[in-house]
């Protein structure tokens, strides 16, 4: 299991601003280790955010995204005290979900 994501969500004027720091190596499959062997690809492929059972953000990532990606997005319809859930899935079908209360 990977390290937890850092998720912050703040509501201001009816708009929720979500900031997410995802811990992931994001290996492209193109780099080589010191012995000259190719490091296998291991990267996030999809990120989904939900609030009150509705998808509020959905994105596709690939090899061009850096290690430990940061994501910032906004959506309408959330209120203080609601929970925002962020889930990523990588190319090895590893999955991580973390949540944060909207403040």
Stretches found by the model and what they are:
Residues 1-16:
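Short, compositionally biased P/S/T/A/G/V-rich stretches that sit at domain boundaries
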Residues 10, 101-103:
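Short beta-strand edge segments in extracellular beta-sheet folds
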Residues 22-39:
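Short amphipathic, basic-aromatic surface patches that mediate peripheral association
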Residues 35-54:
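Extended low-complexity, serine/threonine- and proline-enriched intrinsically disordered segments
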Residues 64-72:
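Aromatic sugar-binding surface patches on proteins
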Residues 72-78:
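Short, hydrophobic beta-strand segments
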Residues 88-98:
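Short acidic/polar inter-strand loop motif in beta-rich domains
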